[in-house]
Amino acid sequence: MKIRASVRKICDKCRLIRRRRRIMIVCSNPKHKQRQG
């Protein structure tokens, strides 16, 4: 999980979701997991 100030989709399978007021990116590729910090 990468904590970033700005999150963006890296590939086509990345999905942007909101969880507990945080914007997160989930993907089938674990390297693409991101959270806005």
Curated annotation (Swiss-Prot):
This is Large ribosomal subunit protein bL36c. HAMAP family: Ribosomal_bL36. It comes from the Eukaryota. GO terms for cellular component: chloroplast; ribonucleoprotein complex; ribosome. PROSITE patterns: RIBOSOMAL_L36. GO terms for biological process: translation. InterPro entries: Ribosomal_bL36, Ribosomal_bL36_sp. GO terms for molecular function: structural constituent of ribosome. Keywords: Chloroplast, Plastid, Ribonucleoprotein, Ribosomal protein. SUPFAM superfamilies: Ribosomal protein L36. It is found in: Plastid, Chloroplast. Belongs to the bacterial ribosomal protein bL36 family.
